[in-house]
């Protein structure tokens, strides 16, 4: 490595003449860790502060640390040495000395004799002699400290780069004793489960018969083989049309399901033992506490004796309890009897297919819809909505919001109406006002409101309940939950609007469901309404909030099963924020990564802003104007209008801000990104310490409370370790999570920890869109969550590689709002418009699905164990621990057999159940006794004779005689699809631009 040009002796003799060094990536520097004396010249220079376990040594802030290096003359003649601190970062943080620096116990005389400097001049070293030189560092701040020491003799030079990581008590407490080691697993043995012995289900996981049973939708063998061979039906070559809609999306869903199966195989275990735990057998599953894989009460796995010669059966084991990394299961009684302490097994984890089957059914049922719901461009004539004035319940509505509500009240069926706009423009509040107006002014209105996650659905319900000026009757509003949702996680003010039995959420019987005027649900849980038998057209209005976050099949669960032509469908969202989470690159590239909302904007009526189809909200009531300025210019053509009042009240009280007039601050930190154990997720202890310090300084002022603060960070390990420290400090009200967990939410103060601090890994992430820093949609969401103050903590030399982050960095610098390490050179980027089409939440994959010799990921977006490098495992797109869009896990491969849960709607509403160990004295639903008295449907799921059990039909679930054996028919014509076309290899797909990816997060 060379960091400086040659200088004359005269120049070196001037102590004050020091050079400059920019950011040096310690992982790319070969001179700092060790040296080979055989590669050196006649003067051999050792390395001070050598790396330990391939990382810089740690030192304590405020204390002097020192180490020596030696210079040996191997020549036959003396040499004249000039040794110098060429440069340090931070400046003047390192010194040189001939004497060993004094320690804390040194006497006064020893301290007085010690002399340190930046340059040791004109030292004559005789042949064979060795000179010992001491390097000292006294760090004032946490972070990486770097210096370059040069040793010159004659015209030759040796450079040594020193890296030290200055830490405080918080960062030191997070030091891991588990070095990172990627699990290099041998190829798994073939593990067939076609023939298995059923296990013992938990007592509360019982079958529930529904009027409309969910078909199995087992993947046809020929379709599976086609896709695995990179072949596909002609429909995919043709593109999405009204004729091939169901077949097109079912093929994409098969691709996605096959990818999930493949990902789950990484979790399979071989040659493992189980322990007796009373009536259970327990299996230790590494990573289970971090939901890798995710298993809950009622799920099942398959095991087979490791040394089975093929004559024994596989055994199914149901999960009865999950404790940390240990899962307690029950198998068939014969398996428990045969088990011994020395028994060794191979284990296969299973992918719960319920959600995927719901998606298959939804796109099948979409063929029953009025075509104008799916393809408004085919609409024969332009519609005109007749509007009537209304009296707003909320006094804060602006003109655009009032206009959009009038349109919703005046709509008469297809096509859908869209309310879209940037963050903080009041989309959800507009929906809430529309719901209340329908409730109070239209006597026969029945409204279904769906959101992508439980927290988002709860948020809507809370808004409805606290709206002043109107009271919704308790018996006219209902919150539908999946049975797997934890009872304990729901707020008391919401639980009274839910239906449950023994702390298990259930879907009420049909008679009860149809009495409600307002039903709030997630997209996935809305499938229970169709299962219970709610007719098409029962709901006069179906409102989809945050519609851009869901895939089109998810949106179709509510729309395709419950709409008639006159049903009013309203979508609210922002296609420039986060979209659906997709794991199959092939499926994403062909359209599964595009939301229903985004696809509608391909129609002229929507993209041209026709007020009879769409309203755009542009007034932001959330953020300080200075916070809005950059995202408005980058993503919304400068149309955002800052409309928040009282923007400076918090800023005025924070004395530590470098610029009180500017609501942002960037703390430049050079830390080390690390991993531990077999977990591929990154964390940065130095940034964690700075996050905690910032939270303490904020809460020291009464104007900012813990609940006012949110911390956004892209890596699961960073989230967990920040929470660990906050728990220790009893500061549990601070919310910490990923960007996905904050979409649709806001906090007075947002702190962003970017984590990455090495160019080597960041460049790899950027190349394949795996990381947080290369994702414009994530960037957009992250920086628009803050109401009053945005704090960014990160390495400026890393984030400046991305155009959007670079602009944010220099905006802070230009407004005197930057503090911390030295800045990089300002980079110039070619301006590119934000691309709305082709969004994706899966990363761009490298070409080969393997790891190279250096231990770097070569493919898949997913790291070992099927997990993305951010640590958020790829099991269904979870947003929080209990934030599955319907409460379901999506954890693996494998399928259920036809004789098992044949209706598909197991455990009282399509769930596998939850861990029931919870509060036994929790408040009971006041309506529970009423539901029990009215009874539940016990036998409503009988199939018609002409309905196939596999579900592969093309007409909403009713098989017709002319349908081909696999259910794949050509747009309803009854003709079999010809197996044409070839999948291009992954390397042949045209890679999307970085700003098209809406998620890089696993």
UniProtKB/Swiss-Prot annotation:
Its main location: cytoplasm. Residues 993-1002 have a biased composition (Acidic residues). Its EC number is 3.6.4.13. Changing residue 427 to A: Loss of helicase activity. It is an enzyme of class 3 (hydrolase). The keyword Coiled coil does not apply. Residues 913-924 have a biased composition (Polar residues). ATP binds at residues 421-428. One of its GO terms (cellular component) is cytoplasm. A motif (DEAG box) lies at residues 545-548. Pfam families: AAA_11 (PF13086), AAA_12 (PF13087), MOV-10_beta-barrel (PF21634). Belongs to the DNA2/NAM7 helicase family. SDE3 subfamily. This is Probable RNA helicase SDE3. It comes from Arabidopsis thaliana (Mouse-ear cress).
